[in-house]
Regions:
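Periplasmic-binding protein-like
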Residues: 112-125, 145-147, 186-189, 237-247, ...
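Bacterial lipoprotein signal-peptidase II cleavage site
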Residues: 22-32
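Segments of small-molecule ligand-sensing domains
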Residues: 314-323, 337-395, 399
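Signal peptide-proximal N-terminal region
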Residues: 45, 71-93, 207-210
Length: 418
């Protein structure tokens, strides 16, 4: 796993024609209405508290993953308030439900910014939700902290990306498969922008590294029927599966994968959207031994992670697990606090100006903001799901990897963003 050099910022991609979570063309109209030209910021910093927005899917197909992210955001806010707040002001969270619908995310983002007057918003999961919100935050000149791994090929002055970009998750997973001798991979994903873009990148990687994509299949978000895809898997002569399914579709996929006798030793599945929180719903008997690619697992051995896991379980119950998106969300609030206090102001321009080089010691390890791309350094980790449902690291980068969202450090990726 290598660390590409930082490159100059490439302008943000326009979201209007990209795919939504249901595979249809993204309709920019709801976001365009939400993203009306801003007046002056209504954020009120004159009192003893400042509002922040929490925007996650608390209902719908993504609630299985996003509800716990909301809990980790609240934990970070509680910790910060107990430690004196931000610039001496208590954080007052305003929670909204994105309902697993991109248009709802855009509408709720506009409400949080214009009506609730929040200083920043933390949330989103699917790339469809992020791309629906992007024009709102840009038009209103407000800040979104987006905590989930994504397909890259984007940078916005109004988004801080605290999850992994492609070179910090997808590429390390492909490197691992190749190093383990896998050459014939089958791609299965949800039908929206993240899986389709990730798979375009995977196809380019495979072509340059002597690997073959022997199948590529998509299902609508929330789909639970995988018999046709599993039969294609059986007939494909694949020796590994790269899984970009999101939400509760993973439950049905792994159960049907196991039901036909497939197993990790024969045809391993590497997943980039299955973490500790999803394992119980899938059933550990259906997924033990399978691989994941993230930057954080509950089993990561750092003092900060020991404190994080203990605090989360003390707050929400001893049997609760922690996961990469939860940790990245938790870290994003602490990063924002560090940026605001470095700037000495809640002002968006001042916070952006202070962002570059801001460092926090997070549960996953050292995280540093790259001010050019507004992404962060991450430590790639390949994990294997254990019989107890936790994930153990089987390969880890020697040091945090700088973000390269446009893959400019990889010759094989030329033209991928076009």
């Amino acid at each position: 796993m290598t660390v590409p050099a930082r490159r100059a910022l490439i302008p943000a991609l326009v979201a209007a024609t990209l795919l939504t979570g249901c595979g249809a063309k993204y309709d920019p109209q709801p976001s365009a209405q939400a993203a009306q030209a801003p007046s002056s910021s209504c954020v009120d910093t004159s009192g003893d508290s400042v509002k922040v927005g929490l925007l996650n899917s608390l209902s719908g197909t993504m609630a299985v993953s996003e509800t716990t992210v909301n809990r980790s955001l609240n934990l970070a806010i509680e910790e910060i308030n107990a430690d004196g707040g931000v610039l001496g002001k208590e954080l007052d969270p305003v929670t909204e439900d994105g309902a697993s619908e991109p248009t709802v995310f855009a509408e709720k983002a506009a409400k949080l910014i214009r009506q609730d007057c929040v200083a920043a918003v933390f949330g989103g999961w699917t790339s469809a939700s992020r791309k629906a919100m992007l024009p709102v935050f840009e038009a209103q000149d407000s800040l979104l902290f987006y905590p989930v791994q994504y397909e890259g090929l984007e940078a916005s002055p109004n988004i801080f990306y605290t999850g992994a970009t492609t070179n910090q998750q997808i590429v390390p997973a492909l490197d691992h498969l190749r190093e383990q001798g896998h050459r014939r991979i089958f791609l299965v994903g949800s039908d929206y922008v993240f899986p389709r873009t990730a798979n375009r990148i995977i196809n380019a990687y495979a072509a340059a590294h002597g690997m073959e994509v022997v199948g590529e299949e998509y299902v609508p978000m929330g789909s639970t029927e995988f018999s046709t895809i599993v039969n294609k898997l059986l007939a494909s002569d694949a020796d590994a599966v790269f899984n970009t399914l999101n939400g509760d579709s993973n439950v049905a996929f792994f159960r049907q994968y196991t039901s036909v006798g497939l197993e990790a030793g024969e045809m391993p599945v590497v997943s980039v959207s299955v973490a500790e929180e999803e394992v119980p719903g899938i059933g550990v008997e259906n997924i033990a031994g399978q691989l994941t690619s993230w930057n954080y697992y509950q089993t990561v051995d750092t003092p900060e992670n020991e404190r994080f896991v203990r605090a989360f379980q003390d707050r929400y119950g001893g049997g609760r697990v922690t996961s990469d998106p939860m940790e990245a969300a938790y870290t994003s609030v602490h990063l924002w606090r560090a940026m605001v206090e470095k700037a000495g102001s809640f002002d968006v321009d001042a916070v952006r100006e202070a962002a570059d080089g801001t460092v926090v010691e997070a549960p996953e390890g050292t995280v540093e903001v790259d001010g050019e791309t507004q992404h962060v350094t991450k430590t790639p980790r390949i994990g294997r799901i254990r019989e107890d449902g936790l994930i153990e690291t089987v390969e880890e980068a020697a040091e945090p990897v700088a973000p390269d969202p446009f893959l400019t450090g990889y010759d094989w990726a030329d033209g991928v963003s076009g």
